Structures are given as structure tokens and as C-alpha cells.
Curated annotation (Swiss-Prot):
Name of the coding gene: hisI
Keywords for the protein's UniProt record, in alphabetical order: Amino-acid biosynthesis, Cytoplasm, Histidine biosynthesis, Hydrolase, Magnesium, Metal-binding, Zinc
Compartment(s) of residence: Cytoplasm
Gene Ontology biological process terms in this record: L-histidine biosynthetic process
Family to which the UniProt record says this protein belongs: Belongs to the PRA-CH family.
The record's free-text note on cofactor binding: Binds 1 Mg(2+) ion per subunit.
Residues noted as binding Mg(2+) in the record, renumbered to the chain: 78, 80, 82
Pathway field: Amino-acid biosynthesis; L-histidine biosynthesis; L-histidine from 5-phospho-alpha-D-ribose 1-diphosphate: step 3/9
Superkingdom of source: Bacteria
Gene3D superfamilies documented for this protein: Phosphoribosyl-AMP cyclohydrolase
Species for this entry: Thioalkalivibrio sulfidiphilus (strain HL-EbGR7)
Cofactor(s) this protein requires: Mg(2+); Zn(2+)
Protein name: Phosphoribosyl-AMP cyclohydrolase
Length: 131
């Protein structure tokens, strides 16, 4: 596979691009993460989402600890070529490290942020005490 397609992406100054994970079938936005060239190549090689963890400064195979992997159905690049959209099958039904289906569980309502999505699995059960 020629790496030329990677050169058409508009990477930020840190060599990253935001990647939105969207659930196939429902169209729900599950999470936003970051990718670099290596994580994007690994994603294509494995068929599963591999992101770049800015906090840990390393590749992060989504679900490597929890088992909640994301099978990539398709990838799209936006019109400015600076944001990726990954259509994924969310295995295990949990995309968020908090144990929720998605990471967007705070809704602005009545002048404050309200939690509107339930915890489906206790993070301690998924990760032990690593959270």
C-alpha cells in the first residue's frame, strides 16, 4: 500500500488528526480520539480502530484493556481533509472508559451539565484499578 494517501491528509502541527467514531447502523457518535500516521496505518492493517493517546504518548488499540474493540466498517475524510470519520461496529457495546455506550453523556440542560447516559459496566470491572 502506497503511503501517498497519507500525504493528502492535513495533519495538525503535532502530526495528528481528530477521528470521530460513529456507530454503524445507528449513526450515533461514540467518541472523539486522535490518530497519527502510524495509528491510521495500523487501523487499516488490523481492521480495528487504533488511536494515538496524547496523554500516554503511545498507540492505543481501542479495547486493548477492556475488550470493547471497534471494528472499522469504513473511513471518511472531511472536505478540509483535517478530520476523519470512522464508522465502527462497537464490540461490547461500550465505547467510553467510564463504562457508558458513548463519551457524550453530559447534556447541557437547565443551566448546567446533566449526566444523561447510564453506566453499563463499572470501569473497575473493565480495567481493575487502572482508570
Amino acid at each position: 500500500m502506497s503511503p501517498d494517501w497519507l500525504d493528502t491528509i492535513h495533519w495538525n502541527p503535532d502530526g495528528l488528526i481528530p477521528a470521530i467514531a460513529q456507530e454503524t447502523g445507528t449513526g450515533k457518535v461514540l467518541m472523539l480520539a486522535w490518530m497519527n500516521r502510524e495509528s491510521l496505518q495500523r487501523t487499516l492493517e488490523t481492521g480495528e480502530a487504533v488511536y494515538w493517546s496524547r496523554s500516554r504518548q503511545r498507540l492505543w488499540h481501542k479495547g486493548e484493556s477492556s475488550g470493547n474493540t471497534q471494528r472499522v466498517v469504513q473511513m471518511r475524510l472531511d472536505c478540509d481533509r483535517d478530520t476523519l470519520l470512522l464508522e465502527v461496529e462497537q464490540r461490547g457495546g461500550i465505547a467510553c472508559h467510564t463504562g457508558r455506550h458513548n463519551c457524550f453523556y453530559h447534556r447541557y440542560q437547565d443551566g448546567d451539565w446533566q449526566v444523561v447516559e447510564p453506566v453499563l459496566k463499572d470501569p473497575d470491572q473493565m480495567y481493575g484499578d487502572k482508570t
